[in-house]
Amino acid sequence: MDKYTKIKHLFEQNRDEENAIKMSKYMRDLFKFYGLATPIRKSFYKDLLKEEKVSKVVDWDFLDKCYEDDYREFQYLVMDYLVTMQKYLTYDDVSKIFKYIKSKQWWDTIDGLDRIVGNIAFKDERINDLMLKWSKDEDFWVRRIAIDHQLCRKEKN
């Protein structure tokens, strides 16, 4: 069983319908949820993240499959994965992350992705020109990333 299927199976087996309804309502019914509390959700892929970190290779096919899933917990998994692997993310990965920024947009994912982009900015100054371009984008969420990615810089200075 591949890692996506294994995690999906765990999410489905542990679904909390009552909590899923509340979570969806909180997000204005924009997304479906399994209703998993954060500690429970993270426990299902904690070991996977450890293994991935040891491999030092970002599995973009796995991440794409997760991000495309209809349930919001999978987008959260992608963000947790990217945070775990941020040491290995480079400027060249920003185009892949941009696909996530443009898809299933809402505060929860955008505010997580801006920190990931912000951490890449510490390693590569080319991000500065890209963020200037994004700051003029017609998409509100892309502009938000361009502005908010700087929060990491404030914390480091």
Question: Which residues does each predicted region cover?
Answer:
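Alpha-helical scaffold domains
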Residues: M1-N157
